[in-house]
Amino acid sequence: MDVLGAAALALFLVPLLIVAEQGRTWGWGSPAALALFALGAAGLAVFIPVELRRGDEAILPLGLFRRGSIALCSAVNFTIGVGIFGTVTTLPLFLQMVQGRTPTQAGLVVIPFMLGTIASQMVSGKLIASSGRFKKLAIVGLGSMAGALLAMATTGATTPMWGIVLIVLWLGVGIGLSQTVITSPMQNSAPKSQLGVANGASACAGQIGGSTGIAVLFSVMFAVALGRLADLLHTPRYERLLTDPAITGDPANHRFLDMAESGQGAGINLDDTSLLNGIDARLMQPVTDSFAHGFHIMFLPGGVVLLAGFVMTWFLRELQEETAPEEERPAESGAGAKNGPLPASDA
């Protein structure tokens, strides 16, 4: 049992996950963040030599990544994690902050995403089972996800809800195709005794990509949006609004006005978006413009990362093109030859 390898892997991943969650609050260059980065680097420095020394008994045999399909599929899963987790999780927030939708309306947009994912997984599974080919499905899947995120980068406050739903459905179809087929070349390339390890490594790459995407893309979005909002709140036109009797006399505006006048306008607490419910449209306009710009900047790099994954899928090899190592092939002259053909499975 590779206890030391498991401990080193935890020492590598856990500090990075903590920074991914808290980095925007602490600051990426804060002492706490830098200390955790250093701790994660130390964990990686211990993990690699330990795993190399353990060989096939390692918790993550690094020799697996010498097989092109396993390394490539892990890289593609990483790009999917970055692009999807870093953007899909923000769609409800986009609908609330930019389009003024209610939390219920914003949450319902996840339904077409799930429907597209489930339907495309079922279809792609049947196609692979009947033909044994997956490369075209992977290309279409990654291309669809990249196209959907780039399309999201063009949306704004006036985009109709049906347009958002179509893009989200398109995104769901793409991820359903990709998730189903991306494991096929990896499983075909891995030794039978290490299929579970290969699957786990690929899934881990996707989770790391998701954490990275959430941390980086969220930080980019908030930095752009709140920086722009701070500038807009200090324009002479907006400062006049803060003293307009029609604005100050409306109780619905009071919480927002208190925040703006205290100099915290760029620090809107997005854990409680009720602050923005019912406020005057003139007060809301800078918030909408700022976050629309921030979301555009976030969706664009997410789409670019998925385009990189799309390019990688062109290098996947079909099942028929993969050949297992000689020692992994079943012996044709062994038990099977002596005892006759194995009975067909009822499955």
From Swiss-Prot:
Keywords: Antibiotic resistance, Antiport, Cell membrane, Hydrogen ion transport, Ion transport, Membrane, Plasmid, Transmembrane, Transmembrane helix, Transport
Keyword hit for Ion transport: yes
Record carries keyword Cell membrane: yes
Cellular component terms per the entry's GO annotation: plasma membrane
Location in or out of the cell: Cell membrane
Single GO BP term: proton transmembrane transport
Membrane topology: Multi-pass membrane protein
TM spans (from-to): 3-20, 30-52, 73-95, 108-130, 137-156, 161-183, 204-226, 294-316
Chief location of this protein within or outside the cell: membrane
MF terms (GO), sorted A to Z: antiporter activity
Region called Disordered, residue ranges: 321-347
Listed Pfam families: MFS_1
Role of this protein: Resistance to tetracycline by an active tetracycline efflux. This is an energy-dependent process that decreases the accumulation of the antibiotic in whole cells. This protein functions as a metal-tetracycline/H(+) antiporter.
Family, per entry: Belongs to the major facilitator superfamily. TCR/Tet family.
Name listed for the protein in its UniProt record: Tetracycline resistance determinant
Native source species: Streptomyces rimosus
Name of the gene: tetB
